[in-house]
Amino acid sequence: MAKEKTTLPPTGAGLMRFFDEDTRAIKITPKGAIALVLILIIFEILLHVVGPRIFG
């Protein structure tokens, strides 16, 4: 076993911080997320209104 002990950096109130970034992930702003949700809600409402006429 190693003779030197290494200690981990302290974390505040049990929260851990990760600094390495995953560049493969999709980056989206909060405004973009809200816009996407609103578009999906409008699309679903339109499907409920005109969907039965289109799909029978």
From Swiss-Prot:
Quaternary structure, per UniProt, is: Component of the protein translocase complex. Heterotrimer consisting of alpha (SecY), beta (SecG) and gamma (SecE) subunits. Can form oligomers of the heterotrimer.
Pfam families for the chain: Sec61_beta (PF03911)
Swiss-Prot/TrEMBL keywords: Cell membrane, Membrane, Protein transport, Translocation, Transmembrane, Transmembrane helix, Transport
What GO CC terms are in its UniProt record? plasma membrane
Q: Which gene encodes it?
A: secG
Q: Which NCBIfam families match?
A: PRK01253.1 (NF002318)
Which branch of life, at top level?
A: Archaea
Query: Where would one find coiled-coil regions in this protein?
Result: none
Family of the protein in this entry: Belongs to the SEC61-beta family.
Q: Which residues lie on this side of the membrane: Cytoplasmic?
A: 1-29
Q: Under what name is this protein listed? A: Preprotein translocase subunit SecG
Note the topology in the membrane.
Answer: Single-pass membrane protein
State the protein's purpose. Answer: Involved in protein export. The function of the beta subunit is unknown, but it may be involved in stabilization of the trimeric complex.
Q: What organism does the UniProt record list as the source?
A: Pyrococcus horikoshii (strain ATCC 700860 / DSM 12428 / JCM 9974 / NBRC 100139 / OT-3)
InterPro entries membership: Preprot_translocase_SecG (IPR023531), SecG/Sec61-beta/Sbh (IPR016482)
**Gene Ontology biological process terms in this record:** protein transport
Q: Where in the cell is it found?
A: Cell membrane
- Give the transmembrane region(s): 30-49
Stretches in topological domain Extracellular:
50-56
